[in-house]
Amino acid sequence: MSHLTDLPPWAALLVCGLMLVGAATTLIGSLGLLRLPDFYARLHAPTIATSGGTILLCLASILCFAVLQSRWVFHEVLIIFFVTVTTPVTLMLLGQATLYRDRFEEQQGVPRKQKPAPGEE
């Protein structure tokens, strides 16, 4: 027997909406990771879309279990905290490491470390 039958209709609609939007946002972030042309563009998809989708899914879980059990769910709050803190920091470090490598290899299209002097452009 599922406890979800005890969920009030207003909460069920809100949980369903949050889950659908969160799943769609996560899917868009994952597709962006696959479809974007280069590494630097691919960094934005998991940072923004996948993190946002995960947060929406956790909010749906918080709402569902808070209504069913009449208590706050702490695990999802920790997940939201760690996703919002670790994902951007990790991808920023990956981006900086890739930029350093590309500058070291002198690849075309990589921005310079410093602005060029006035006659050097």
Swiss-Prot record:
It is found in: Cell membrane. GO terms for cellular component: plasma membrane. Keywords: Antiport, Cell membrane, Hydrogen ion transport, Ion transport, Membrane, Potassium, Potassium transport, Transmembrane, Transmembrane helix, Transport. The keyword Cell membrane applies. It is a multi-pass membrane protein. The chain crosses the membrane at residues 10-32, 45-67, 72-94. Part of a K(+) efflux system which is required for the adaptation of R.meliloti to alkaline pH as well as for the infection process during symbiotic nodule development. May form a hetero-oligomeric complex that consists of six subunits: PhaAB, PhaC, PhaD, PhaE, PhaF and PhaG. Belongs to the CPA3 antiporters (TC 2.A.63) subunit G family. This is Probable K(+)/H(+) antiporter subunit G. The gene is phaG.
